[in-house]
Curated annotation (Swiss-Prot):
Chemical reaction(s) catalysed: a UDP-3-O-[(3R)-3-hydroxyacyl]-alpha-D-glucosamine + a (3R)-hydroxyacyl-[ACP] = a UDP-2-N,3-O-bis[(3R)-3-hydroxyacyl]-alpha-D-glucosamine + holo-[ACP] + H(+)
Function: Catalyzes the N-acylation of UDP-3-O-acylglucosamine using 3-hydroxyacyl-ACP as the acyl donor. Is involved in the biosynthesis of lipid A, a phosphorylated glycolipid that anchors the lipopolysaccharide to the outer membrane of the cell.
Pfam families on file: Hexapep, LpxD
InterPro entries: Hexapep, Hexapep_transf_CS, LpxD, Trimer_LpxA-like_sf, UDP_GlcNAc_AcTrfase_non-rep
Protein name: UDP-3-O-acylglucosamine N-acyltransferase
Signal peptide: none
Keyword Lipid metabolism: yes
EC number: 2.3.1.191
Biological pathway: Bacterial outer membrane biogenesis; LPS lipid A biosynthesis
Coiled-coil boundaries: none
Gene3D superfamilies cross-referenced by the UniProt entry: Hexapeptide repeat proteins, MurE/MurF, N-terminal domain
Amino acid sequence: MSFSLDELAASLGATVQGDAGLIVKSIAPLDQAGADQLAFLSNPLYLNQAVTSGAGAIIVSPRDLETLTAEGHAAGRNWLVAANPYAAFARIAQRFAALGARPAAAGIHPSASVGEGAVVPASCSIGPNVTIEAGAVLGERVRIAGNSFIGADAQVGDDTLLYANVSIYHGCVVGARCILHSGVVIGADGFGFAPDFGPQGGEWVKIPQTGRAIVGDDVEIGANTAIDRGAMADTVVEQGCKIDNQVQIAHNVHVGAYTVIAGCAAISGSTKIGRYCIIGGAANFAGHLTIADRVTVSGGTSITKSIPKPGHFTSVFPFMPHADWERNAAILRGLTRMRERLQQLEQQVKHLQQSS
């Protein structure tokens, strides 16, 4: 379970400065790494840690290596030089993880239930108490852990991994090489009810949700996230998206490719999120909005209008000591009166100027 630096460099298109034959056995943080471990420097704020690190080698950018060299700290050390050290670290970490992974045995557990006409290739691994309903189609090497549910006519692409207790409702589609963590629900009914109330009362009338939820290739979805099916058209999450735990994606939402969404965010129905967006934790979006490509939304922000062009958007009031917040809140409550008073003063000044 080890790699040489030149082997890692070749896989990344990186270069080695120092001993290219050095063998590293794992990756560790700069301040904890030992002589047989690889660390990474992706933020120049940690240059001092790189100087004192005991790592056998460090992944570094050309610019940071220039700084270390100019300060006399690079000589006699081993450096794996990559344009994007953080991405290089991630890819190397994947290689080490693959070395230690225990492959799932192909086959269907005796307690699993497979419906009539379902397609389950021999290369798939189906865990205990899994239900695969009639007409569902799995790709090659799909792994489904215990107690998961695949609804009728649903589709799951090649090499996708479903952890325990994942539910994919009828007719929904999950692409290839996806990872769905425990508790994910794909294709539950969207929150659709028509009000029918009069003077004597009434009720909320359920709107059947007849669309699907479609998840593209290479998507990872965190634990207990829900992606609802569309009311009539489909809910879509395009390829390469990464979605954190406990995120709500409502019916008819469309999330563009390679967008990332942090935990507890909520996107209301029929909103369209562009490609390459970054959505912070607990951000929330009103319904029927359109968000441009490459928009960043800070955590906790409420988006109530469409965003037509790229940029970074924040609506969160900065935190402060509670007593200060209470004083500021009291001032905010009086803003209308203050505005009216200011207008009166402006009129008085204008009158005095005209009289002089």
